[in-house]
Swiss-Prot record:
PROSITE patterns, A to Z: N4_MTASE
InterPro entries linked: MeTrfase_CN4_CS, SAM-dependent_MTases_sf
SUPFAM superfamilies linked: S-adenosyl-L-methionine-dependent methyltransferases (SSF53335)
Organism: Nostoc sp. (strain PCC 7120 / SAG 25.82 / UTEX 2576)
TM regions (residue ranges): none
Stated name of the protein: Type II methyltransferase M.AvaI
Domain of life: Bacteria
């Protein structure tokens, strides 16, 4: 018996409202439309015991060689990909797509299984992680590994006082202790003497440790600052604990890359009994790239889009983006290019390419009732940010465009697996799983299953403070093109 036979029906009991809102006509309308979708998908919802939060997040990758190099917390695990490919589908694929590739978990898992993997990623940090892993797997030579060993042993950045300027953003200024910043700049100067491949891998090693040697910690929507930081925005109370010494952190990271790479070399030709396949990465927004793809081309799509949770990756990964040379104007453009999941996103022009998707969204009753409620709350000054209604509208309208393109590029009979979370704003639960599944159905997909995790997630700390803690569904959607 496989883990995907350990499913059980689940009774949906979504109460999208607070008790003190029940008499509100806007809220009553939301509740009515929500219950209608619950009834529509009642037979598709399945509680899945093996889908823990660990397996649908980065946590399960922390012990996996290569996957553990960079802690990309928004990723799902390689174990999830293997479950979906080998246990759920139980058939061979030639080519799989991830339109939100992130750190490339799906790409490398499929490549190791002998499946051609294509990905699209807009953020430079994800692009860099994928590129460096490809370099180490496919281009690094024996002498390149020997150079890494020399760096590990000799610490050449400590043998001179020359420095290369560390790029900064307003949000990253003052992020490191002065002695750490000096070490970083000596390190950057030293790597300039290496060949382009060794240089890129060494810079990646530095990229992997930036948070651990800084005054900052990634905290959902922003960077949280330690009280020891020399800036006014640092918290008077927050103490992130030990800030690692630069030499200790960078040598341990180089050692980790070497150890995992030696394991890679010893197993380089065969994994799952087949030769590793190619990886293609397209560096841009999937809204730009997907329309360029051939119709009926992919055997499967496995993806996890950004959640509609206000997380701004240009802030949480600001240290890494600065090291990669991203400037202030680039940050503004990146925020606009990304899927609308932050309050700073401006409305995108979608009307020329996706009129059918927009028509479907305009008729989606639950979403439209939620948008009317949020606009009313905005007028009443009840929202903690005025950009929330625009963000939520943009998120679903853009996701509809992505879904319609995914439908177009999939072969007949092929599945789309999507990991996503429900969210809550202004005391209202937004059933992302039901809304997106309804959109997918209108586009032409068969909604095969909505696999629900046994334990959901809490709403944001802001929501808890005003409306109390409430568990929200976390799911893996399974849609299939007929």
């Amino acid at each position: 018996m496989t883990s995907f036979e350990l499913e059980s029906p689940i009774e949906i009991k979504t109460d999208p409202t607070d008790l003190d809102q029940e008499s509100d006509s806007f809220v009553q309308e939301i509740s009515r439309f929500n219950k209608a979708l619950e009834q529509r998908f009642r037979d598709k919802m399945r509680l899945h015991e093996s889908l823990s939060r660990k397996i649908v997040s980065f946590q399960a990758n922390k012990s996996k060689p290569q996957y553990r190099w960079f802690k990309y917390k928004e990723a799902f695990s390689v174990d999830l990909v293997n479950q979906l490919i080998f246990e759920y589908e139980k058939k061979s694929f030639e080519r799989i797509l991830d339109p939100f590739a992130g750190a490339g978990t799906m790409l490398f898992a499929c490549s190791d299984a002998g499946i051609q993997a294509d990905g699209i990623e807009v953020l430079p940090i994800g692009q860099e992680i994928i590129e460096v892993r490809k370099i180490i797997q496919r281009q690094f030579r024996r002498e390149d590994f020997l150079r890494l060993i020399e760096w590990y042993k000799q610490k050449p950045w400590n043998q001179h006082n020359n420095r290369k300027y560390l790029n900064r953003l307003r949000i990253t200024d003052g992020a490191y202790p002065p002695e750490t910043e000096a070490s970083i700049e000596r390190f950057l100067f030293s790597i300039e003497k290496e060949n382009i491949l060794v240089k890129q891998v060494l810079r990646f090693a530095l990229l992997c440790i930036l948070e651990s040697i800084s005054y900052t910690r990634k905290d959902g929507q922003y960077l949280r600052w330690d009280k020891r930081a020399f800036r006014k925005s640092g918290s008077d109370k927050f103490d992130k604990g030990k800030i690692l010494d630069f030499d200790e952190a960078i040598t341990e990271q180089i050692k980790l890359i070497l150890n995992d790479s030696f394991d890679l070399i010893s197993n380089t030709l065969f994994c799952y009994g087949t030769q590793r396949s190619g990886i293609n990465l397209f560096n841009a927004s999937c809204l730009k790239i997907l329309p360029e793809f051939e119709q009926d081309f992919y055997d499967c799509i496995i993806t996890s889009p950004p959640y509609c949770n206000r997380y701004d990756y240009t802030r949480t990964y600001a240290l890494e983006l600065a090291l990669l040379g991203v400037g202030e104007r680039d940050i503004v453009q990146l925020r606009q290019d990304m899927l609308s999941c932050t309050v700073e996103n401006k409305e995108k022009s979608l009307i020329h390419n996706w009129q059918e998707a927009l028509r479907i969204l305009d008729k989606q009753e639950l979403l439209q009732s939620i948008l009317r409620f949020l606009e009313r709350e905005l007028e009443r000054k009840k929202l903690n940010n005025n950009g929330i209604p625009r963000m939520i509208k943009g998120y679903f309208y853009e996701m509809a465009c992505v879904i319609i393109e995914c439908f177009r590029v999939l072969k007949n009979g092929s599945p789309l697996f999507m990991v996503n979370d429900n969210v809550r704003y202004a005391g209202i639960d937004i059933s992302v799983d039901l809304i997106l599944s309804n959109i997918a159905e209108e586009i032409g997909f068969n909604v095969e299953k909505i696999l629900v995790l046994p334990t959901g997630k809490g709403n944001s700390s802001q929501q808890m403070g005003t409306h109390g803690r409430k568990t929200l569904r976390k799911c893996v959607y399974v849609w299939r093109k007929p």
